[in-house]
Amino acid sequence: MNKLSSIEVRNKARNGENFTTSGLAQGYVQTNVVIIPKKDAFDFMLYCQRNPKPCPLIEVFDPGDYESNFATKSDIRKDIPEYKIFKDGKFSSNSTDITEFWRDDFVTFLLGCSFTFENELMKNGLDLPYFKQGKNVPMFITSIDTEKSGKFSGKMVVTQRWIPREKLVRSIQITSRFPNQHGTPIQVGNSSEIGIVDPYKPDFGDPWIPENEELIPVYWACGVTPQIAIQEAKLEIMITHSPGKMFLTDLRDEDMAVI
């Protein structure tokens, strides 16, 4: 499915198919999604602005709108492979279609995702085995506090990729070109420095067991971070994408690159 267009991936999700989007529609920008009531939207937008590394804003919808300006004929209620619904800060259910939950006061936020720069990493010879294995990137809750806004606060979540020592500098250079997709790493080589006790046991996604000692764990900020903040805020209702199952836009990766 890596040769599909963004529209084709959205249509598969709209038809009820449930799948991980890592490696799909390569070259198209993928985003994290957060949907919350209007009364909480300003504080959350400020939270994103204060924490641009894990929460890079791509688009904010008007209340009640469900079509993205960056995805032709899209429907945010149906075009994600799987959603997570939270009520009063607690997980309620998963769904492949949130039309029945939709409200006119819902505000949708699209946030940058590191899947965007993965294509560039692979072009430069970096192996990301979870693509071939149909698995999800490892994600960890760190000990790093995010900057508070109103009721929103929490720990930063990161993604993990094991990078060959000789390609470490190149991987940092590549990801630095994508500040709206988390940019440069948060930490390189020392998992415990950011509170990760066991780098082989992620909080979300699938474990990545390195093949040799030349691979170094590298951590990038992750768009699952706001899900943690919103859960702790105990909003009456929140809807997000499921980790690793993103929204595909029609934007191209090169549209996001700064150099």
Specify the residue positions occupied by each region the protein language model found:
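Aromatic- and glycine-enriched beta-alpha-beta binding-site module
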Residues: S93-G150
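Short, flexible turn/loop "capping" segments at secondary-structure junctions
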Residues: A25-Q26, S149-S153
